[in-house]
Amino acid sequence: MNAGRRAAGTLLAAALLLAGCSFGPGGEGGEEEPGPSASTRPGDGKAAGMRGITLPSWNTGDYSSPVAAAYLRQIAATGARWVTFTPTWYQDGAADAGMHTTGETAGDDDLRHVIGLAHRTGLKVMLKPHVDLAKGGDRAGIRPRDAGAWFTAYERFITHYAKLAEGAGAERFAVGTELAGTSRDGARWSKVVRAVRAQYRGPLTYAANYDEYRTVPFWDDLDVIGIDAYWPLADRPTADAARLRDAWKPITQELAAFSARHHRRILFTEAGYVSQRGATTAPYSWTVSKSAGEDEQAAAYEALLTALDGKPWWAGVCWWMWDDWPDSGETPRRLAYTPHGKPAEDVLRRRWRAGSTGAD
């Protein structure tokens, strides 16, 4: 989810999550360049669905905060097996060629600390670094004037975190999130992926927005297709889980075909709904209405899991998001994306804790 949109506190944020299955990197000979793992392909009996939740950070010290451990325990108590962390750098303008840390960027030592904390809590980790616009706005609008300079800066940024992820033992890594303004440049992105593989030996994905994934040309360089699954499911407010489940049918048919074409499973690197009336009409929006809609949020969780669980091409979901930081400046908690303390959390506990068959 776009932190710039969060800071703006208004509509439109289409975002990120990720985690997945125990896939290893490819490459059979010692001299061969690492590549995607064949075990990520649809129908592989060893591949399992991810059960994950994102714990974002909005300030430098969030991940070293005393409450971080409590949040991780709460996430694990839902039956989740994975947590995603989102260190974020910023660029000042959409056409700029550089990015930098700010007071909102998680510190490296804090990130290492929280990865270790997650492991001690029994959770696997996906590291999903983000680039956002410092003054707010959609990161999909990043379209640098000098593409070559931007990709050079981006490669420095993303390989920094790839090396950190390798050293800290993170089990999965995302090479980018919702960068639709650059993601059609397949040659440059393939170079980025190769640079990441030189630093990180685990499975890789890219988190494309739901309206971006079809135009990404470098899926075959990665181990799993990542989609931030913010498809609108209704044209008016509804807490009818059956109706919402039916809305997934044409989407899942399209995704099954896309997975087959690319011989890759599809991970919902993000999916989520605010607890507001009308959330299912615009899942990407932080502010759909001022009216609470916890039942609609719960119905949307139920519908997604019912519609997708058991699909051989589906690699699972990392929900956006578990965000209870006292200083996050986000939408009031009762209206926010977090399922914590709401009926949606009960859905996760019921679905995820009932059994572990096919889960990672």
Please identify what each model-predicted range represents:
Residues 2, 21-24, 39-47, 283-286, ...:
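Aromatic-rich peripheral "rim/lid" segments of glycoside hydrolase catalytic domains that contact
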Residues 2-26:
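Secretory targeting and sorting signals
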Residues 24-27, 32-77:
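Boundary/entry segment of secreted carbohydrate-active catalytic domains
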Residues 39, 78-97, 109-182, 278, ...:
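Substrate-binding cleft and catalytic face of glycoside hydrolase catalytic domains
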Residues 61-77, 151-164, 209-218, 298-307:
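Short, acidic/polar
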Residues 61-77, 100-120:
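Aromatic- and glycine-enriched glycan-recognition loops and surfaces
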Residues 106-108, 113-121, 128, 203-205, ...:
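Glycoside hydrolase catalytic-domain groove-lining segments
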Residues 156-157, 172, 182-207:
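Active-site neighborhood of glycoside hydrolase catalytic domains
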